[in-house]
Amino acid sequence: MNVLITGTSSGIGKGCAKYFLKNGHKVYGFDRKESTIEHPDYKHYCLDIRDKEMYPELPPMQIVINNAGVQNEDDIDINLKGTIAVTEHYAVQPEIRSVIMIGSASGHTGSEFPEYAASKGGVLSYTKNVAMIIAPYQATCNSL
C-alpha cells in the first residue's frame, strides 16, 4: 500500500513510518525538518503542510496519517487547516482505505492552551466529516 504520513522526522510520525516500512509498504513523509529515515521504500518531502503549492504529485494513497502538529502561535493553521488541506488533496479519492488523525485529549477536555485545544477539537469534528465523505469508498476515518 501507499501510505502518506505527515510529521515523520520524529515521534509518532517516525514510529508510524518505520512500522509501515517494516511491513512492506511504500511510505511518503512530509515534514518541515530533514528526513531521519533511511529506507529504499521511503520518500521524504521537506515542506510545510500549510503550503499547498508545495504538495508533490504522488500516486493514489491507501492510507493517510495526519500527524504533523505544533503547540505554538500556528496551532490552528498547522494542526487544523494543514490537516484539512492534506486530507482533501490526498485522501478524498476512490483508492483510500483509511485516514487517521492524531488528536489530543485536549480536543475533548480543553487545556491551558486554548488555541491548541481548539485546533485539536476541530480535528475531532473534521474526523467525523471525513468519515462520511470517504464512506462510499468503503474507507474509514478515525482520530487517535
Q: Predicted segments — roles?
A:
Residues I134-L144:
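Conserved Rossmann-fold SDR core element
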Residues S98-G122, T127-P136:
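Catalytic loop of short-chain dehydrogenase/reductase
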Residues S9, A17:
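N-terminal Rossmann NAD(P)H-binding glycine-rich loop of SDR-like oxidoreductase domains
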Residues P40-D51:
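Rossmann-fold cofactor-recognition segment
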Residues N67-Q71:
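Conserved NAD(P)H cofactor-binding loop of Rossmann-fold oxidoreductase domains
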Residues N23-I37:
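Conserved glycine-rich Rossmann-like NAD(P)H-binding loop of the short-chain dehydrogenase/reductase
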Residues T87-E88, K128:
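A short, exposed helix-loop element centered on a Lys and neighboring polar residues
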